[in-house]
């Protein structure tokens, strides 16, 4: 990351005349011949928006088997208003650049030609390598925005602020002390955020340890005999797990309770979500805790939406596997 920032900063001082000339030579019609059958690949090729201070456009992307995001290179060349003739000299055979067929059908790499450029997708690193060699307006802002995609805007602002301070130190040494003090305050604020995050992680670890102790006690107790349910079946505890896919994430909802209340609560989710589990369970709360724990152990990010409703960064198959393993 630091190496990339250094290269970006060194480049930002280059001559901007080439970028202005490239912008004057840009013609959007030159890119019309590159297209993908959007209807045929609509279940694989997705759309997203790129927005920074100087550029705004839509681009296509796909996810590889490793869930890495790959960007359509031609969409970025067109959106950044790069002259078409300039991209003809690019090296499209890099190990971070893939044809759509290589991602979908796992075909062997083949020689790139002009007819296949519209179906080329690159990882973030591969896209940055290509764009670094091309001239276009406001290049530094665009590259920084691509590199920091998905991160919080305040982090990007802090990085830009640090780079501005470094340039000021090189240009005017008399302002060194003022700039140094500002930089020190920003670093101090960052460490405060780290400390807060550590406290949050410590609280989560304590919660997981408590859950582990509870699970161990229940498992030990279950070895001494079977679970006995009340003769009155209306007193039995029920558990239902619902799922819904939202973009690349999974929304999970848990419903529990005795039969009368349980039926009413299920009605909130039955019409819109898929049922993964629905039955009598001796301890629904413990089951929910075990499901969360399994997802944490597999390093999937979990975000709480509402009471007993969570958002998980994983695939439907992963959720089904965890539900089957726990329940």
From Swiss-Prot:
<dbReference type="Pfam" id="PF12299">
    <property type="entry name" value="DUF3627"/>
</dbReference>
<dbReference type="InterPro" id="IPR022549">
    <property type="entry name" value="DUF3627"/>
</dbReference>
<protein>
    <recommendedName>
        <fullName>Uncharacterized 38.7 kDa protein in PK1-LEF1 intergenic region</fullName>
    </recommendedName>
</protein>
